[in-house]
Amino acid sequence: PCVIHTDDAHEYMVLVKRYNPNNTSDKETAFLVCNTKGEILLDYGKDTEKGELNMVYLMDKGANPSILCVYQKNGILTMHYTPLPLNKSALKGAGTAQDPYQLTCSNDFKLIDNNPSAYYEVANDIDFLSIPFEGPKRAFTGKLDGKGHTLSNLCLMGRGLLNEVKDSAKITNINIDKPILLLSEKHLEMAVGVLANSLQGGVDTAGVASYALLSNVHVANPVIKAAGYKEIIGTIVGYVALNTDVNTCSVTGADIVAPSAQVGGVIGKSQTYSQIHACLFTGNAEGRIVGGITSEVSGGEPVYDCRVDADLYSSNTIGGIVGHSGRSKIYNNIVYGTLNLSDTTKVGKVGGIIGHVDTDATGASTDILAENCLVALTSINVPEGKDVIAHRVIGFSSGDDYEYDWDNVDWSKPQSEWPRLYFAAEKNFKNNYVISDLAPVDATIQLTDTTTEGANIKAEDLSQTWLGEHGFLFGEEVTAPWVYGKSLTLWFEGELNTGVEDVVMPEGMKFDGTTIMAQGMLEVYNIQGILMARANGSINTVGWQSGIYIIKSATSTVKLLIP
């Protein structure tokens, strides 16, 4: 799409024989590109210096498409390349806040390189047709507003749609559906995400901070395959830092397989005064260090008001919300799903909220590290007979950390037998609870709200009043993002598939909240097209994950949101 020209007209390439209008006996071969508006965009015929047109190639498979025309004169071939698209600097708009550039098709994104500090809007839904795409290369410092439109079927290899995004850049209101991101050991980017590799604010020479923003960006059904890639992956952005705010973002239906990489369900890694809040991750993710929201926070980067409902897999470290925390504050989050540690060759670290919390060797810090978090996991699965530190709330923390008693080391013995001095148990956890159906992982730890195992609470006791008393704010905005219902959700979750909830069931089909009923044979598929159930007359949906399903009966097909 938009290879030849990035407007909304359809283009045609024509190879013709034509007469010279001034000499009807003089014929030439000509190559023309025209569009459905009756315009001739390109006209290559005989050239007085190069000779007759001999061959034409459309070279559209790489990152820099072009048209190659080959001329012949006196036995000498001359090649002429025309870069595509033909309107490399032509975007509607002026690039200002009042009149942003309009992005109308896939190749328009490449034109961002011409003015990366300008204002841009996505003018309509854009289908990238699963064709490998390489976006702009220069650092983007402008504003990009998706206006709620959807970019579908992105196919990215080795890097995100945008490369580096920095300074006071803002990216908002974009939906991305069914993107594919492929990575291998050959790819050298230190961090990669579907939308952007990195997003950073900054500080100018006078010490004035500039803030970057990522807000209301939603990625549905992403597939990320990264065999051999060992760096950082975040579904939306690989790495955020330096005064960056990430809020109201979601990743749903993810399928991420990156066994050697750090994997964050939403953001790969957060560093240097950034924050992530009011974000959602659902699906499954596999990596070396895995966090449902982010794989790592370096310290001073809060993660709060986030929800995860996922199956997470790792050979090293897993946290339902954060994989590895350098003592950042993680609060008012909830996690559903399962945590699964594979047959690790190192010390495995697993926590329902945080997999690993760095030790404060001084013991002087009083900063709260995990507060008002809820663990509603179905299971925490770790291999038997392996060196694993796992707890329902926090995996590894200071109570599991040690230094060697160097004064009493017997140097003739192996290191595994050297005496150890363990640090005191971490004191900076409070008000963390676990739905009591999940058994304690470590029976030696007290089940209180200040320990790594957390306190038990029954699901029926999670009233809106109790949650409000523990910092969960209810409303329909980023500062009060929670909705109380069958499960605790974020306010925007019901809007991710706008209109689906309002589908009117056709006559003869009913859904009472748990059972789908219709005359004759029924089939139900999930949003990925996988058959979930087939039955005559009725299908019970109790125990199904919340989400969008496709229902087929003998007379109709409809979409249904199962809460």
Q: PLM features: residue spans?
A:
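Repeated scaffold domains used in trafficking and secretory/extracellular systems
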Residues: 1-4, 50-60
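Eukaryotic scaffold repeat domains enriched in small/polar residues
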Residues: 3, 8-12, 67, 505-512
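Aromatic (tryptophan-biased) beta-strands that constitute blades/sheets of beta-rich domains
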Residues: 42-46, 533
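Short coil turn/linker residues within repeat-based beta-strand modules
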Residues: 37-38, 529
